[in-house]
């Protein structure tokens, strides 16, 4: 089925939309030269550039400048039972990796447990991104805190090309999270790994009356 058919009546809007707010000359448009155009002149070392190229150069979107990553942190951030009950085969970590490969993803991002269980068999077949920290949901009341579940060296030893981490900006523990993640990413770069930061706002004060300012442009931009 063609994309036009999938989009139906919205095809014209999505496929032919032209942004009038920001001229495209002011942004770095994704393309085959993404590494050379955006990253080559940065302070990233050669090994890290190599890892970035491994991400950008894999899967169906290889060397287009676009990246498709399968993220699965069920079992820690989310209930595996609630997520996988309709498809129990995904309780097996290997099937998560197979899904990413069959889907033509650039990489698969998951936990130490999921990726570590199949690293020897699959780390050379699809780029691994190991998520370093997680919010565990068994503590009550939930504190919106990201806790380190492993080390950068563990991720490197299992053959991962990148590590990722989350920071809950605005939360009570955000300053500690910023320090922990920045130190972890510094070491990851020393080892030649790419890094990915997932950013979320978490503060009850951002909600006032009936308005939720977590999505406000000046907070998310």
Labelled PLM ranges:
Residues 23-29, 62, 67, 74-221:
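Alpha/beta enzyme core
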Residues 1-78, 83, 116-125:
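N-terminal amphipathic alpha-helix/helix-capping segment at the start of soluble metabolic enzymes
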């Amino acid at each position: 089925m063609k994309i036009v058919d999938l989009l139906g009546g919205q095809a014209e809007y999505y496929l032919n939309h032209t942004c009038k707010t920001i001229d495209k000359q002011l942004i770095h448009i994704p393309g085959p030269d993404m590494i050379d155009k955006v990253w080559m002149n940065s302070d990233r070392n050669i090994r890290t550039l190599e890892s970035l190229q491994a991400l950008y150069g894999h899967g169906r979107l290889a060397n287009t400048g676009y990246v498709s990553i399968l993220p699965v942190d069920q079992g820690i951030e989310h209930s595996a039972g609630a997520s996988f009950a309709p498809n129990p085969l995904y309780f097996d970590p290997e099937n998560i990796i197979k899904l990413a490969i069959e889907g033509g993803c650039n990489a698969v991002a998951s936990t130490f447990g999921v990726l570590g269980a199949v690293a020897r068999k699959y780390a050379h077949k699809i780029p691994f991104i190991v998520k370093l920290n997680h919010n565990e949901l068994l503590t009550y009341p939930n504190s919106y805190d990201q806790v380190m579940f492993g080390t950068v060296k563990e991720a490197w030893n299992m053959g991962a090309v990148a590590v990722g981490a989350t920071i809950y900006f605005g939360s009570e523990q955000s300053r500690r999270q910023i320090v922990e993640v920045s130190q972890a990413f510094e070491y990851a770069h020393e080892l030649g790994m790419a890094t990915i930061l997932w950013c979320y706002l978490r503060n009850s004060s951002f909600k006032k009356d009936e308005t939720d300012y977590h999505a406000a442009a000046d907070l998310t931009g």
